[in-house]
């Protein structure tokens, strides 16, 4: 469609409200394609993430902050990472729309700032395979990669970081099966649920809860 974007009429963005959470979405930013099934996806990820009290949540491939913004109030700190700059801008706006105070550091709020709800939240414009999350010590990681799956280095880094729990949201079960060959060496499947986000197609959104082996 080209790189030039011009708003002919209206605000140039759309807004969705999922389970009471407000989301602003720009034209180039990713958001869940099925707004009617999105609440089921969100509630499943929330369930599979478990108790986030006093925990650090890392949301990789976070898009406009669909999961991160909704779960941040329950966690000690939340970090979202996404390649697309427009999506990260939206994610920061979405945090503010929902009474969260985003920071520019790894979950630490600017001096003098305090979150109105939950813990600190920050969003970072970066490739997942190039983002250094080792210093984060994430307890729970949400993975929602594109249909092409995860970069091999990102997968290796996640395994090396040793989060206690991973919630993997996959729209391509073939790539998920390939990645599970490696993940299954270190993680057990605790639960799995398929959500029909793409009616009348052969595709489903597969959500899997993985727990670190003892």
What residue spans do the PLM features occupy?
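Accessory RNA-recognition modules of RNA-modification enzymes
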Residues: 1-102, 120-143, 148-156
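Short, conserved catalytic or adaptor-binding loops enriched in Gly and charged residues
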Residues: 98-101, 113-117, 182-183
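Short Gly/Ser/Thr- and charged-rich N-terminal loops/segments
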Residues: 106-120
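Small/flexible residues
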Residues: 109-110, 149, 167, 214
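S-adenosylmethionine
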Residues: 122-204
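Core SAM-dependent methyltransferase catalytic element
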Residues: 202-214
